[in-house]
Amino acid sequence: MRVIAKKILRDFWKLHADSEDQLKTWYKEASKASWSNPTDIKEEYAKASILKAGRIVFNICGNKYRLVVDINYLRQWVFIRFIGTHSEYDKIDANTI
């Protein structure tokens, strides 16, 4: 998968240093993955939430942070749509952000 907007992750872990290792690990794993559907993701990330229209929510640092991505399975693209604290996540609509 090609992860688009790594800078968003990098900027976030500069502000939240405790997230750096897990975000780097997620980025590396996602970059090497060849997901073809949400089931592939659930096999690797059982706690990921599958939303509509290709959106996936990943729990980072034991659900302290939330990462929302939009996936184009055909083109193998992962777009970072949101990374934030759990309380920040509660204020957005993950389906449309």
Predicted regions mapped to residue ranges:
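Basic, Lys/Arg-enriched alpha-helical interface segments
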Residues: 1-64, 72-79, 86-97
